[in-house]
Amino acid sequence: MPSKKVIKKKVAAVPAHIRAQTQVQKEVKNPLFEKRARNFNIGQDIQPKKDVTRFVKWPKYIRLQRQSAILQKRLKVPPTINQFRTALDSQSARQAFKLLDKYRPESTEAKKNRLRARAEARAAGKKEEVTKRPNTVRHGVNTITRLVETRRAQLVLIAHDVNPLEIVLHLPALCRKYNVPYAIIKGKASLGTVVRRKTTAAVALVDVNPEDKSALNKLVETVNNNFSERHEEIRKHWGGGVMSAKSDAKKLKIERARARDLGKL
């Protein structure tokens, strides 16, 4: 069955004389309301709606975080401290964590079961087998310092956000002194998950299984290229010294005024 043809009706145009009247008519304003320019300075007109996040009274711990972040931008940061702002790239970090996860320390439950089985075997009068300590990730600043000084550590990973930083400040220089590969990695919490803790300042690998030797060698090569071999460059690189827009504008204003005065002389 053929569809019905829809006929659209055209609306008649507005006559010319009426159109002219509508264009001529202007909005009638009340003369009692005077038009004046607004002044948004302090203590003057009501401010327009805007983002007032900057003026929020934050809790004390957040306020300290914000102040610390701003101070680190403003003040000149020595290279020894500034090196902790440059962390290992994400791809290499993923490879490092993939390797570390194979050598996580045993959980509390696993340790309990192992000791229970050992106690039962001893009670049954079976001969006790002396087994070698399995290769695991070592953590704790004192432990890692000792491993580096005895040249037993094969790879050291240091967290970039340790607070206070003085805890791990000596580790990069110590690792370079004893030719131990080291890397600064993002997140003390990420390192903490490896050793089943909330956070940890640094971790170290002492030895790995034969099947993981090649993975460790590749990782050590990447780490050395990024940190140990770039030591001279890192040593010269200061941080901070970035001023706010307000300070920059003030400085520019003073410089322009000085240039104007010199021009007059």
Swiss-Prot record:
SUPFAM superfamilies, sorted: L30e-like (SSF55315)
Nucleotidyltransferase listed as a keyword: no
GO cellular component annotations of the record: cytosolic large ribosomal subunit
Keywords, comma-separated and alphabetical: Calmodulin-binding, Ribonucleoprotein, Ribosomal protein
Subunit structure: Interacts with cmd-1 in the presence of Ca(2+).
Name assigned to this protein: Large ribosomal subunit protein eL8
The organism of origin for this protein: Caenorhabditis elegans
Homology family: Belongs to the eukaryotic ribosomal protein eL8 family.
PROSITE patterns in the record: RIBOSOMAL_L7AE
One MF term in the entry's GO annotations: RNA binding
Family matches, as InterPro entries: eL8/uL1-like (IPR050257), Ribosomal_eL30-like_sf (IPR029064), Ribosomal_eL8-like_CS (IPR004037), Ribosomal_eL8/eL30/eS12/Gad45 (IPR004038), Ribosomal_eL8/Nhp2 (IPR018492), Ribosomal_eL8_euk (IPR001921)
Keyword Lyase: no
Top-level taxonomic group: Eukaryota
Single GO biological process annotation from the record: maturation of LSU-rRNA
PANTHER family xref list: RIBOSOMAL PROTEIN L7AE FAMILY MEMBER
